[in-house]
Amino acid sequence: MSFNEQNSVEHFIVHKLTGINLNAIHNGMVKEDAVPYNDETQWRYIQPDLLPRDVSDVLWEKELKESLCRINPFIASNPERAEEVIHKLRAIIITVGNVGLVRANEEFARWLRNEVSLPFGTNNQHVIVRLIDYENIANNSFILTNQFKIRTREVKIPDIVMFVNGIPLVVGEAKTPVRPAVSWLDGAHDISVVYENSIPQLFVPNVFSFATEGKDIFIGGVRTPLEFWSPWRIENEEEKLSHLLGLHDIAKQLTHLLKPSTLLDILQYFTVYATNSKKKKIKIVCRYQQYEGANAIIERVKDGKIRKGLIWHFQGSGKSLLMLFAAQKMRRQQELGNPTVLIVVD
């Protein structure tokens, strides 16, 4: 068998996240053990032709409706309410051509973070509609598929699409590891320049996208310029040495980034929307050092340590954003009550 980007890197991603070895399929699916996530929920693989959807559908509506009923008792008691929610989500996706991808993505993110209420309560009282169960991760469905064909303005087939409760939150592109002229940048270009313009509806619910050639993995949010895509790494002395020697294990970085708890953590606390110097709306997704640093600060606060920690930064590494991410997550931790966060800048 000759190696190409599909049967090498793409199938490697599927195998590591779900335990399905697509290169070993003959008459049926070969199931192996997926990478353990410390007893967390894992990704489940479904072949793209087995997803019950029309090729123009962004949302997997059957799965989404079941999830809405499972997570929200007031929808389970009246399933027609699920149709009303899905109708509103579809409306956001449709508006992308008018309001732009970043603004549509920001509006959809409010729903994903469970910040929207509807009059579904007693006497038409407004109650929060939960698309995702953040308190019990196992109560959500995590589905991964590959070669996902979608038709909006054009027909495109992203390599990897990852659904949470029937909503596509992650898009990934895999490139060949055996051609020196090809790198993760080619995959990022496909996503940022090609897919986001030809099938923008798929990216309205997007948390982040990733690109890899099997050596490095880079991530970016919607409309992130290629020069601002950032690597995702695991920072410890052993991994740092391995990376310098060219021996780092991409599988560890991949599974760390894409495990369900990390994905939902980034969705809740580690993405922000802002306006740049050109007064243009932008989305910012954390870099790996901001994610690790902010979580380390919060753990020290929870542990009651007097010294909350000192983090060394170089210029342009995103110090202000790290403080913002840490404050954003800290203020939503129930066990911390209502903490006062003091940020000093020079």
Predicted regions and their residues:
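ATP-dependent helicase/translocase motor core
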Residues: 2-345
